[in-house]
Swiss-Prot record:
Homotrimer. It comes from the Eukaryota. Substrate binds at G81, G82, N83, L84, R103. This is Putative 4-hydroxy-4-methyl-2-oxoglutarate aldolase 3. The lineage of its organism: Eukaryota, Viridiplantae, Streptophyta, Embryophyta, Tracheophyta. The modification N-acetylalanine is found at A2. It holds the Pfam family RraA-like.
Length: 166
């Protein structure tokens, strides 16, 4: 995929920004994974300290998509670790954004996938299978809908209602 720059995308899409179709997430995420720059259509998940749905989703073909996980901002355990990072890479996900924590950071950093999360915590999550898929989630000051597009690079993360021509 051609490299893009989120700053450039903001400058050249002022109208989309003013009407709310292009939004920047608040700068609350840390950068993990090999891909500092990634983009794709969004699949949303809403879970709380339980990552069964995360694994189920990453076991499917990603086809260049980005999994956006609203973990409610919990800092008490990790929703994604090295195994799931590897699964995401092998199944063709371009990235994972977690409103929550990751673990096995060194392993995730070896994976060919972009990962953003609030931080890391070595504790694993529960495995009950609770949560919702393909629902609107509220992360980093913006509402994110399943099927919208995400663009991430070193400057930050953009959410766009439609695919941008970059
Ligand atoms: O299964 C988990 O809880 C997450 C994890 O450690 C991994 O992906 O390796």
């Amino acid at each position: 995929m051609a490299a893009f720059a989120t700053a450039e995308a903001c400058d050249s899409n002022a109208e989309l920004i003013s009407n709310g179709d292009l939004r920047a997430l608040h700068p609350i995420f840390k950068i993990y994974g090999q891909r500092r720059c990634f983009s794709g259509p969004i699949v949303t998940l809403k879970v709380f300290e339980d990552n069964v749905l995360v694994r189920n989703q990453l076991e499917t073909k990603g086809e260049g998509g980005v999994l956006v996980i609203d973990g409610g901002g919990s800092m008490r355990c990790a929703l994604v670790g090295g195994n799931l990072g590897q699964l995401a890479q092998n199944n063709g996900w371009s990235g994972i954004v977690v409103n929550g924590c990751v673990r096995d950071v060194d392993e995730i950093n070896d994976c060919d996938v972009g990962v953003r999360a609030l931080g890391s915590n070595p504790l694993k999550s529960t495995k009950k299978g609770h949560g919702e898929k393909n629902v609107p989630v509220h992360i980093g000051g913006t509402l994110i809908r399943d099927g919208e597009w995400l663009y991430a690079d070193s400057d930050g993360i953009l959410i766009s209602k439609t695919e941008l021509s970059v």
